[in-house]
Amino acid sequence: MYEFKITKLATGEESIIFGYDMTNAFRRAKLNPAEWVVWDREYID
């Protein structure tokens, strides 16, 4: 599983989401990927 550090384009809000890939992480967090920038990805067990 991966940890993705993301920032919302409109507000600068930072968040962390988790998933098996980027699509899965956004789906699990119920976020629109078009509104966010992923700036770091780290593999976690």
At which residue positions do the language-model features occur?
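Short aromatic-glycine-(Arg/Gly/Cys) micro-motifs in beta-strand/loop hairpins
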Residues: 1-13
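Amphipathic alpha-helical interaction segments
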Residues: 10-12, 28, 44
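A short, exposed loop/beta-hairpin motif centered on an aromatic-Gly-Thr core
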Residues: 11-21
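Short, mixed-charge low-complexity intrinsically disordered segments
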Residues: 30-45
